């Protein structure tokens, strides 16, 4: 009787593992399709130099690059920007965004009077 339960438990665990693998594979495929669509749109709205610059930004600050990609795609789809965006225009966009998100830190050192 214990062997039956063990076999049944093993079967349930195997099915659950297969289901999780299937879901992970589907999620990976969905992300790859989305990335391919984004890439295709960015090829249309960015010059090769601008795409290279964005790829360099993505290496250093992936979150910033992702935000810029999403904004550019949204602006292009709504017709608010003229394609293709040059490297110089992308530099201006990057400068504006980094100025908005930049945090300035101030360090103050006070003497404690230890002598």
Curated annotation (Swiss-Prot):
CC per GO annotation: cytosol
Annotated disulfide bonds: none
Keywords in alphabetical order: DNA-binding
InterPro entries documented for this protein: DNA_bind_arc (IPR022889), PDCD5-like (IPR002836), PDCD5-like_sf (IPR036883)
Molecular function terms, GO-annotated: DNA binding
Superkingdom of this protein's organism: Archaea
One Pfam family linked to the record: dsDNA_bind
NCBIfam families given in the database record: PRK04239.1
Family as reported in the entry's similarity comment: Belongs to the PDCD5 family.
Protein name listed in UniProt: DNA-binding protein STK_13740
Organism name: Sulfurisphaera tokodaii (strain DSM 16993 / JCM 10545 / NBRC 100140 / 7)
């Amino acid at each position: 009787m214990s062997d039956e339960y063990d076999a049944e438990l093993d079967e349930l665990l195997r099915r659950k593992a297969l289901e999780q693998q299937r879901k992970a594979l589907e999620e990976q495929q969905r992300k790859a399709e989305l990335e391919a669509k984004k890439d295709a749109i960015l090829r249309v709205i960015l010059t090769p130099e601008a795409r290279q610059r964005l790829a360099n930004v993505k290496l250093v600050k992936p979150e910033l690059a992702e935000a810029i990609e999403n904004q550019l795609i949204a602006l292009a789809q709504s017709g608010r920007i003229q394609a293709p965006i040059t490297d110089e225009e992308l530099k201006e966009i990057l400068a504006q965004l980094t100025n908005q998100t930049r945090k300035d830190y101030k360090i103050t050192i006070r003497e404690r009077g230890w002598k």
